[in-house]
């Protein structure tokens, strides 16, 4: 493949998203402990393409994930907004996790992978975790009640939209996928 150079003469990384159905969380995504997923929510981009992810019972580890065979340095990102709870946990399988306060835009202190959070307006944040993935399952998105705690109560919820998994050190602009992965640039 060709190397892209920008106007400043710098090498530019091509973009990719290896997650399937990157914003259809009720399709190729697998649920852990049966969170309820409701589409048609108001999103960060002004569309009604966001999803409410809600705990349908009290307990721990209410999550969604995909089985993806991908290795190397990976960045997993998702847009998230607080609902009735302020926290999410993101996990790269076989690597570790990081907590995010999606009400206040803070990366939690609990976790074993690097995390970043960026405000995109209207209470939405793009959260991302970085690590060297070496397993065929994951990435995960969990509803969390606090930094370091995935125990939730019935009805606890957060809003999510536009997940992306890619090679690299930082999340690139989102690329939507359907039944296949996508690349650009």
Task: Go through each PLM region and give its residues.
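Extracellular and organelle-lumenal recognition/adhesion modules and their flexible linkers in secreted
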Residues: 1-185
């Amino acid at each position: 493949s060709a190397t892209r150079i920008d106007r400043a003469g710098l090498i530019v990384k091509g973009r990719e998203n290896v997650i399937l159905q990157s914003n259809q969380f009720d399709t190729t995504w697998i649920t852990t402990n049966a969170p309820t997923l409701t589409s048609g929510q108001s999103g960060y981009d002004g569309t009604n393409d966001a999803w409410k992810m809600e705990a349908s019972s009290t307990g721990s580890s209410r999550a969604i994930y995909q089985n993806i065979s991908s290795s190397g340095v990976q960045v997993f990102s998702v847009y998230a907004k607080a609902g009735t709870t302020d926290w999410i946990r993101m996990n790269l399988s076989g690597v570790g996790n990081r907590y995010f306060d999606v009400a206040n835009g803070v990366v939690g202190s609990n976790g074993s992978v690097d995390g970043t959070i960026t405000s995109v307006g209207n209470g939405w944040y793009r959260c991302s975790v970085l690590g060297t993935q070496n397993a065929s399952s994951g990435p995960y998105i969990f509803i969390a009640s606090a930094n370091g705690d995935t125990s939730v109560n019935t009805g606890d919820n957060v809003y999510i939209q536009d997940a992306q998994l890619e090679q690299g050190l930082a999340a690139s602009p989102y690329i939507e996928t359907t039944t296949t992965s996508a690349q650009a640039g």
